[in-house]
Amino acid sequence: LGDVYKRQIICCLDESGSTAGDLAAWGKAVALTLLEIAQSEGRKFALVHFSGPGRFQTDVFLPGQSSLEEKLHAAETFLGGGTDFQTPLAEAERLMREGGFENADIAFITDGECSLPETCVEMLQKAQSELRFTVTGILLDEGNAGMDFSLKPFCQNIYRTSELTGDQIVGEIVLDRV
């Protein structure tokens, strides 16, 4: 499917306090590389920065319409605080239903220090079935291998920074689906 039709990308980026420092740099590098790929291929890209419950910021990049200043602003954003997976996933679904991202897949970048309640997993699976999107998890576990248990319930694929470089992760994601 990836070779026939390039899908839009919604990238959910964990900016909780536990990702401050090197993990935040890894996450931004992967997110911005996905943005560059989307732009070079004329695809829409949304970056959903998230931390605690209800705390998020969405930057939308349309093909040929985003400036360097907008990209720098996205790169400099860091929300801090706790971690909540429900908020960014709800925002991603809203973008698919109302925001012009009806043909998007989700890249979910996190250190995995959170979990999603079973009711939310069920709602997400229903939305995935209806909207036909995938969620690819990118686990920022460099130096702390593990933690994929929080992503397994809702991600179809999980890549780890402890096992692959940022470029390898992006290459795998692009080849796989996005």
Describe each region flagged by the PLM.
Residues R55-F56, S67-A104, C114-L116, I138-M147:
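Von Willebrand factor
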Residues V4-Y5:
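Short, small-residue-biased leader/transition segments that mark boundaries at the very start
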Residues W26-E41, L47:
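An active-site-proximal "capping" alpha-helix that borders the catalytic cofactor pocket
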Residues D84-A90, M147-V178:
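C-terminal helix of von Willebrand factor
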Residues V60-A75, C155-L164:
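Acidic, Ser/Thr-rich peripheral helices and adjacent loops at domain boundaries
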Residues E15-A25, E113-L116:
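Short acidic, Gly/Ser-rich segments with clustered Asp/Glu that frequently serve as metal-coordination loops
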Residues Q8-I10, N103-A107:
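Structural motif
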Residues L79, G112-T161:
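VWA/integrin I-like adhesion module and closely mimicked acidic/polar interface patches used
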